[in-house]
Amino acid sequence: MNTLQKTAGAILSLSLLCGMQVYAFPDYPSLRGQIIEQSDICQGVVKDANGESIIGASVLVKGTTNGSITGLDGDFSLRNVKKGDIIVVSYVGYQSQEIAWTGGPLNIVLKEDAEVLDEVVVIGYGAVRKADMAGSVAVLDNKNFKDQPITQVADALQGRVSGVHVENSGVPGGSVKIRIRGANSISKSNDPLYVVDGIVRESGLDGINPEDIRSMQVLKDASSTAIYGSRGSNGVVLITTKIGKAGVREIMFDASVGVSNVYKRYDILGAYDYALALKEVKGIDFSNEEMQSYQNGTAGIDWQDEIFRTGITQNYKLALSNGSEKTQYYISANYMSQEGVVIESKNERYQAKANLSSQLTDWLHITADINASHGVRRGGSFASGKDNPIWIALNYSPTMTMMAENGNYNTDTYNSIASNPVGILKLQSGETMTNVFNGRVDLRLDIMKGLTFTTTNGVDYYDGKSYSFSSKRVGTKSGMGNNDTYRLMLQSSNNLTYTGSWNDHHLTATAVYEVTSSETRTMGITGNNLLTEGVGWWNVGMASSRDANNGYEQWALMSGVTRVMYNYKDRYMLTGTFRADGSSRFAKKKWGYFPSIAAAWTLSNEDFMKDVSSVQDIKLRASYGIVGSQAISPYATMGLMSATAYNFGTNSNFTGYWANDIATPELTWEKTKQFDLGLEFSLFDRRLNFSVDYFYKRTTDALLKRSIPGYVGGNSFWVNDGEISNRGIDLSVTARIMQNDRFQWTSTLNGTYLKNRVERLSGGENDFINGSSPAAGMVDYATIIKPGEAIGTFWGYEWTGLDEKGHDTYTDVDGNQMIDGGDRKVIGKANPDFTLGWNNSLSYKNWDLNLFFNGSFGAKRLNLVRYTMASAEGNSRFVTLADAYLKGFDKIGSSATYPSLTEGGNNLQPVSTKWLENADFLRLENISLSYTFPKKTTGFADLRLTFSCQNLFTITGYKGMDPAGTTFSNSSVDVDAGIDMGAYPSPRTFTFGLRMNF
């Protein structure tokens, strides 16, 4: 191990001291700066063979829980030690030492241990040395985001792992879209599989405290994901949570407060200019008194000021861990409150976790883990549609007053948008409460040397209750709704693993039998025209009309898994995996089979590379495998009936039943075949590390829903139809630019190039599937599924500028001398070609600085907010965008982008290149500065102060509030992605944090 590696190890340990829970026993002023012999105090220093201090080494009195870790100078101090006690000193990468204390100071030198230098990586149903891996697995340690005010786990993945793309709705506690190497499915979920400590979570990442995470592994290629078979096609995120440590008591308290605001707004017309425009274009007069009040600011409304606010985020975390050589525990609790930057939007989380691990006998080990959370999210819907309050606010007249004399919220008389945006947010909001409980028990039996049996049994419980209320003070009628979703998933995994070595051969063989069952129950009730609004959504008994519904789903999965990993001389690695899944979701073809194979060659361990000192750790990897998706409802292959009303005779209405879905018993799995070719190597004595992967995925038997004409019975059915491909390159570069005792600088760059393409639909190259309308009655469908194009492709008109009258013009694609549906064409796509993340960590003495950049290039956004703000026709009926009036054709002539408002007959198309904007951006996602006061300074604990800023600046040409913002209708699919119709803006947040390690 060279000096650089040792220094890096020291810095790693320093970050653990500063960023993780650490307990150190009370400091004594009389002992500072020197080592004094004392009858019950054992002191000493731990160094490596070169005399460099080792920071963070574990020092323990053998057979007790009396322990500590070394400080910044490699020093330690233990109380209540008797002469003759055995002191055990250990540190990752070094051989442990046991020394009998004779009463004097200890000067301990640890020797390198080559056998443990390799990082251990958690993979499906096991763990493996990183050097032995043949597949593509990305590892994200909690140190990568330790000083960043992350409120949800998905934020930690954004930009930090190549091949992973994250889009956040921005709503506190709202939806997050995560894609691993692109979208594989057209109409079903593209979300990855989440596995926490070996248990699959249908509840996703809800209820997980980021502080509890030890590491995350992202399985990307088929060699890694095939072990999850029918649920691995979209990639797998493995999360390993924290546990207690033997001999080290750790108490941690962390508190942070953040202030958020909207840092970019639209330039809209003030009340005075709006009134002038109305008079000029519509001939609407205002009195002199009104115009005077608009001009001096005593009247009028700035709707952005009304709906946006300063949001406050509070986050408090407490953790305690301890343990002996045989039993360890970890307990944590978290309270988080996040006020959104839109009024009435808020998210709260109450969470607790406990973990107990014990070696009961020499051959039996048990681990028990529970995680419980209660979440409350308040606020309305910010999805695409004419009810989005942000979109409404940006189109509402600034000349109106907020409230009517009768106490109702006023509506805008100059457009046809029915509801007041402030009224919607205050009186038509809702509340969603979620209770998530996850628990597991592991039993590991060490049958004989190298042979272990582990049974992991877990539960994933979710109960979500949503309440909604609408007031007649805002709309035309009052209403309420209550909905409850209950889901319980049980999983039992039984794992037999053999690990053995002989001569230069190393073999690990795993066999797994697993059963999973899940049931979901739903119940809902709505009421309209309430007699009184006094009790909000607890009001169904006073509704003049009521409707109720309920539902039930159940499914089960039975699986068998085998995996063999072979290593010869640490040069040649071969991994083979096979999984068989039997799913109750399919009527006939219940069983699917998912094999994979991977090979790796570590060239740097070959004899002919011994004299090559310029390059280290060269490894070539290749893998191929098949994974699948069973992402359909449990009864999708069956013919389902539903009630419907019909007339019979002249004055009689009857209720009957008809086929809601047509049976498709031959429906089977989506299958994704993936090839991966990777190269890893290091330069300059491992100061510069590279990893690059080329991948190609092709999904066949895509699950699509097709419709049949009404004259032959109507309705829809599921089919296996279509093929989708994803190809690209993942790149990761880590540079340890500076590593010495005082200053360290590490820089990591992750990048992914991705090309998504629909290869085939059953109708041939001219077949296509329309997307959905983002706002029915105002905008037609904006996207299309078409062979040769990406999922999420925009289908619209090519804008060619303004004519001599100031009218918008478009390309006449079909040449019929008019602009109609035949002139639509592919005009862009929602998903980026290239994404990157760039992280820089700098440390100087007790100071730490972190800068994290996130970028996306090649994506388009359909800015329907700007379209309606610039339109004097349709639902908005009049402009609110300042440039649309002040820089229109009638004001500045031929250089204008916006048409003349005084010239009628304009053809303003919403889905066109005029409103389809370049969404490229480079953003300083986070900058944080921390200072650590060591315990010898404070006298009671290590104290770390952190100041950070999220979204400090964004470089972009996008004209909306946020180039990364989209209004999700469904975050699991990608067909209608990239539409901004009032996307919740990502705020700029300043956070101050305090962390104490006792």
Residue ranges and their predicted role:
Residues 1-353, 360-361, 365-373, 411, ...:
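Short, small/polar-rich motifs associated with maturation and membrane association
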Residues 145, 190-191, 311-314, 348-350, ...:
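Extracellular/periplasmic, surface-exposed regions of secreted and cell-surface proteins
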Residues 154-158, 721-725, 767-794, 822, ...:
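C-terminal extracellular loops and terminal segments
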Residues 252-298, 719, 736-830, 893, ...:
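Conserved small-residue
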Residues 284-298, 313-315, 384-422:
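Acidic, glycine-rich flexible loop segments
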Residues 293, 304, 542, 583, ...:
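Extracytoplasmic gating/loop element in the C-terminal half of outer-membrane beta-barrel translocons
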Residues 829-862:
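Glycine-rich, aromatic-lined ligand/substrate-binding cores of catalytic
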